[in-house]
């Protein structure tokens, strides 16, 4: 009788443990079911980065005084400042400035400590390339302004996803019935179809 009761007790404990594990698993599953989808049909849809996003560095050649503060504060001594000393004026003359974004960790120290504010962080994050050497930007490439997603006709910027609604701290509190993050390819095509027709069949007004 004692052995039988021990077996029953062991069976009850195992059943209780299995039920607990099932409950924990279904809790995670149903929690994910309540979340909003996060799919974005890139590159037809792009998220607008947050206000303090640390993207590609923008550089203004005319403001730079070749002080090399950016090199000293960089954790990996990345910026390359090429300058010569003008013996007549006894001042530095900047010749070239470059940053290799294949090595950069985007910490923002160079931007923070620049005395002339010639460096700034942009929201540009599309730096993919087939050759890593193309990620070494010189002063000309660094001086180009980043492309604006909101003015690109081939891209639908998701403005409503840049920030959470006012007063909402947890993204799980946003109901699933709100605006979807991503759209299906056919929905993207339907949205772009009128614009594609305008490109294929442009309207030409006769000369008066």
From Swiss-Prot:
Assembly description: NDH-1 is composed of at least 11 different subunits.
Binding sites annotated in the UniProt record for [4Fe-4S] cluster 2: 74, 104, 107, 110
GO biological process: photosynthesis, light reaction
Source organism (scientific name): Prochlorococcus marinus subsp. pastoris (strain CCMP1986 / NIES-2087 / MED4)
Cellular localization per UniProt: Cellular thylakoid membrane
Organism lineage: Bacteria, Bacillati, Cyanobacteriota, Cyanophyceae, Synechococcales
Membrane topology: Peripheral membrane protein
Gene expressing this chain: ndhI
UniProt GO MF annotations: 4 iron, 4 sulfur cluster binding; iron ion binding; NADH dehydrogenase (ubiquinone) activity; quinone binding
Its biological purpose: NDH-1 shuttles electrons from an unknown electron donor, via FMN and iron-sulfur (Fe-S) centers, to quinones in the respiratory and/or the photosynthetic chain. The immediate electron acceptor for the enzyme in this species is believed to be plastoquinone. Couples the redox reaction to proton translocation, and thus conserves the redox energy in a proton gradient.
Annotated 4Fe-4S ferredoxin-type domain residues: 55-84, 95-124
Protein name, entry field: NAD(P)H-quinone oxidoreductase subunit I
EC number(s) on file: 7.1.1.-
GO cellular component, one term: plasma membrane-derived thylakoid membrane
PROSITE patterns: 4FE4S_FER_1, 4FE4S_FER_2
